[in-house]
Amino acid sequence: MTLYFEEEGDVKLPLECEALAKRVVEEALDYVGCPYEAEVNLLLTENAQIHEMNKEFRGIDRATDVLSFPMIDYPEPGTFDFLEEQEDCFDPESGELTLGDIVISKEKVLAQAEEYGHSPMREYAFLIAHSVLHLTGYDYMEDEERQVMEQKQREIMERLDILR
């Protein structure tokens, strides 16, 4: 698995961001049964930048904690068999499945960790697990989908032994 990691801005999280991100992405992909080596882009930024991205790409005029930009349109969440005939979903040089981009606000990680009464590490890991589910076709437009996604997030966090 390849993680392309970039960090911008002055806010720092009190943890090893790149190493933890790689661990969470690998665990989440294993959990959903991704049979391919994959690549993910992760950008850690601040509220002003994620606000602009949220406004531009989603039409929502406020900062958010995490944005996910999947590169693949899945017919069903967490299904990968259709990809064998989708050469454009794989990096031509590495052969890895190109899942997409994750953007996280470091300020939101710190604020939400405090608000929810857990560590910044737990909040950061949760947001990455949440986003990887989006990158593999999961969403929560309907209540049933939300329940499925929440259960999967909990199980990934339990497998990582990163609890509240």
Task: Name these PLM-found stretches.
Residues M1-A125, L135-R164:
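An acidic/histidine-cluster motif and surrounding catalytic segment
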Residues I128:
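A glycine-rich beta-strand to alpha-helix segment
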